[in-house]
């Protein structure tokens, strides 16, 4: 992993508040429980977050039928919704919005717990199918951050959509060309462009 590169780790709290809820009570009204092969999971239903989490986990489950070791990286799930501040930052965790999931915890999963080399070793054995399934459904992976958080997946479809655009051969279209242009989406697209550009 490259030093001081944290793709998708930056958070736009104005966007998060607008899309997922701007207070604990507002966020909690947006939470739903999804039933998965890994158990019942509480997640935010806005912006199709819960629906896409279910799709990602269903896809991982199917892959685990061919490789049972995959589930060792998933179960038990360490957590989703937890209204809290990130230590030493004063900023809300994405778990506070119900848009992040921590899969099965390993002592080498977090940059504050172990040296970089141990994190790199853990990333090297992490099943690609888990990462690919989550990214396919709009999640960024904390294992791609130099401040690694390997068990962490965070729902940020706007980042995935924009990243895919910049890796496609034809960049003539705007990154948001296939997103319906209702008032809410236009407001969110403008926020994203303002923060990323």
What is each PLM-predicted segment?
Residues 1-144:
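Cell-envelope/glycan interface and biosynthesis
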Residues 136, 149-197:
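Low-complexity, Gly/Ser/Thr/Pro-rich intrinsically disordered linker/tail segments
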